[in-house]
């Protein structure tokens, strides 16, 4: 059985994601497609607009065979750890033949060359990186500038690196490749050229509109029919059903009062979070005293060194309670389990193959004794239940994977 994998967030699923699924199947000629997906919180530091079980069901209805949850520790981490968490889980299954991700450049060799350089970190690169960081430049930008200067004698290469590293999906793709190299994985990487609007584009203006534009529309409008052209049919019908039921779409602003209340209640332990350094905690505390929306709060805190998404992740981690965990130790380890959120009949065959070839623990229901990584997922869902009244406290203990039969793809 030829099994391919994709790493996704689906916040929410749109036509660009359906394109990714179809192109992956065509490019890899796979018999089955496994998806590892962020749960109730996503990498930019937002609560997911839909709960993880609803997202997983949509994925199965649109061509994925098996959906595995990416632990919250990784889904709310930098691109480096986000990628490593996903790839390490996939590699541990011992049955994944390939992984396919979208990128702006669509050239696997160019991305592979940069990934190799970043992983090996030659001395000159380290010195250049430190010099830029010392100037107060964000890590992502400093890395970009260091690589450009490292290749200053090769004008074409230098210009290409600058272009590649200025685009988010290229950066994430490089991190997937670094993780594969680090793990000495046999999984073969593929990339497809990303289609449609940039993820920051908040306008609905083409077939492949961004997830940001869809979230913005849902936040401001009630006429779901406008989104019919931008969502897969099954996803559009599910959204209509959810709206009819009075489903509560979770938006980032819904976290703010909980975060502010936590701060004024005396929980001033942001310094325990990995991404918080150099007095950033005090900067955040001061901003919490006078900002009442997510955008205004993050907008006041962010700087050249601290990017918008990094601040968003810090706020999300604080909301959930990451500061009470030994994050350094957790991030240095690799997950020893996979949690199934949804499957179809082909996905069940994939699960049988995993059981035969891998020693990783497969969870369809939560075990009596949960490890630290899994307990953090449970805590995240409980925090999410404050934002989404369709999700109960301890929902993780009540839910089993959905098995969907006779999908059309």
Swiss-Prot record:
NCBIfam families, per the entry: PRK13670.1
Record family assignment = Belongs to the TmcAL family.
One Gene Ontology term of the biological-process aspect is: tRNA modification
**Which terms in the GO cellular component ontology are assigned?**
cytoplasm
Q: What is this protein called?
A: tRNA(Met) cytidine acetate ligase
Keywords of this protein's UniProt record, alphabetized? ATP-binding, Cytoplasm, Ligase, Nucleotide-binding, RNA-binding, tRNA processing, tRNA-binding
Q: To which species is this protein native?
A: Clostridium botulinum (strain Hall / ATCC 3502 / NCTC 13319 / Type A)
User: What Pfam families does the record tag this protein with?
Assistant: HIGH_NTase1
Q: Does the keyword Glycosyltransferase apply?
A: no
């Amino acid at each position: 059985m030829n099994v391919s994998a994709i790493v996704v967030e689906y916040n929410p699923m749109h036509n660009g994601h359906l394109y990714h699924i179809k192109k992956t199947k065509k490019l890899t000629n796979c018999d089955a497609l496994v998806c590892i997906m962020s749960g109730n919180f996503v990498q930019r530091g937002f609560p997911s607009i839909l709960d993880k079980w609803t997202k997983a069901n949509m994925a199965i209805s649109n061509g994925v065979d098996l959906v595995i949850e990416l632990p919250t520790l990784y889904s709310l981490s930098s691109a480096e750890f986000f990628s490593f968490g996903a790839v390490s889980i996939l590699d541990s299954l011992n049955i994944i033949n390939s992984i396919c991700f979208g990128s702006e450049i669509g050239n696997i060799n160019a991305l592979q060359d940069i990934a190799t350089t970043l992983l090996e970190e030659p001395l000159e690169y380290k010195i250049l990186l430190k010099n830029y960081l010392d100037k107060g430049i964000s890590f992502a930008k400093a890395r970009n500038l260091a690589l450009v200067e490292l290749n200053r004698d090769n004008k074409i290469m230098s210009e290409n690196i600058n272009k590649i590293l200025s685009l988010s999906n290229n950066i994430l793709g490089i991190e997937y490749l670094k993780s594969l190299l680090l793990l000495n994985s046999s999984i073969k990487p593929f990339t497809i050229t990303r289609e449609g609007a940039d993820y920051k584009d908040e306008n609905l203006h083409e077939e492949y509109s961004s997830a940001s534009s869809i979230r913005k529309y849902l936040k401001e409008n009630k006429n779901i029919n406008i989104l019919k052209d931008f969502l897969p049919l099954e996803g559009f019908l599910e959204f209509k059903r959810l709206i009819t039921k009075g489903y509560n779409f979770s938006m980032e602003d819904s976290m703010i009062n909980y975060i502010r209340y936590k701060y004024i209640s005396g929980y001033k332990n942001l310094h325990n979070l990995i991404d918080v350094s150099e007095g950033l905690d005090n900067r955040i505390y001061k901003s919490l005293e006078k900002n009442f929306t997510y955008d205004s709060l993050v907008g006041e805190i962010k700087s050249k060194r601290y990017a918008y998404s990094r601040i968003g992740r810090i706020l999300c981690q604080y909301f959930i309670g990451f500061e009470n965990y030994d994050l350094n130790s957790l991030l240095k380890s690799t997950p020893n389990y996979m949690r199934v959120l949804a499957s179809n009949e082909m996905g069940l065959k994939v699960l049988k193959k995993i059981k035969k070839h891998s020693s990783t623990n497969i969870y369809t229901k939560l075990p009596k004794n949960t490890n630290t990584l899994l307990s953090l997922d449970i805590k995240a869902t409980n925090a999410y239940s404050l934002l989404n009244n369709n999700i109960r406290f301890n929902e993780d203990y009540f839910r089993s994977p959905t098995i969907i039969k006779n999908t059309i793809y």
